[in-house]
Design a protein with these regions (language model features):
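Amphipathic alpha-helical packing segments from all-alpha helical-bundle domains
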Residues: 98, 117-143, 155
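Amphipathic alpha-helical segments used for helix-helix packing
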Residues: 84, 97-118
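Hydrophobic alpha-helical segments that form the core
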Residues: 149-170, 183-190
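N-terminal intrinsically disordered/low-complexity leader segments
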Residues: 1-7
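C-terminal peripheral helix-coil segments that are non-catalytic and often amphipathic
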Residues: 87-91, 95, 132, 136-140, ...
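Generic hydrophobic, amphipathic alpha-helix propensity
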Residues: 8-19, 33, 58-62, 66, ...
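Helix-turn-helix
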Residues: 11, 19-53, 57
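Hydrophobic alpha-helical connector segments
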Residues: 57, 71-100, 153-160
């Protein structure tokens, strides 16, 4: 029985996550959550906490999944870090292209992180982990003599992580895959030898 309950817990959490993703945090009401998750308020609170706690659980689940995708670039042992940078930047925007929606973390950064410190800290911690992935790939590029000599990998990693959000914005507005791919190549060329 515990196995079934755990499955339902995760399944319902995914439903809530997609609802926050679709509607945003502020627009999503407890009534919306009850209706979509098919559980009542008296079950939501003891299981998931209040609406904000539920969002935190959803963000945690989402960020762990995305971070796992990013970290896969650290274990593949590629001999071309620049190609991995292109793949990393593509990963950051592919969801918008394929699923026609912006990254949940990016959405929450702009919707709620300015006014909620707890959520901002959670999103910031995740961003720092993503930057570590970029930094490791950039350092590999330096070792492979593919990246300009003297590049500050830590600052460049922060720049690449921020740039992926900017390119995501560009794609959402213009819906031009070719231009987005060109921007990614241009960004990588800026640091190439």
């Amino acid at each position: 029985m515990a196995r079934k309950k755990e499955f339902e817990y995760e399944e319902k959490l995914d439903i809530a996550m997609h609802l926050f993703w679709e509607q945003g945090y502020h627009v999503t009401s407890l009534s919306d959550l009850e209706s979509h998750m098919k559980i009542n308020r008296s079950s939501i609170y003891p299981t998931y906490g209040d609406k904000k706690e539920l969002l935190l659980k959803c963000l945690d689940r989402y960020q762990k999944s995305k971070l796992s995708e990013y970290r896969s670039f650290l274990s593949d042992g590629s001999d071309n870090a620049l190609e991995d940078l292109v793949k990393l930047l593509n990963l950051a925007i592919q969801q918008s292209i394929i699923e026609n929606r912006v990254c949940l973390a990016v959405k929450m950064i702009f919707e709620i992180a300015l006014v909620d410190e707890e959520i901002r800290h959670m999103l910031l911690a995740n961003e720092k982990e993503i930057q570590k992935v970029y930094q490791a790939v950039l350092e590999r590029g330096i070792q492979q003599h593919l990246v300009k000599k003297g590049l500050d990998a830590k600052t460049a990693a922060a720049f690449f992580a921020s740039s992926s959000t900017t390119m995501l914005k560009n794609y959402v507005l213009y819906r031009n895959r070719t231009e987005t791919a060109s921007m990614i190549r241009m960004l990588v060329n800026f640091i190439s030898r």
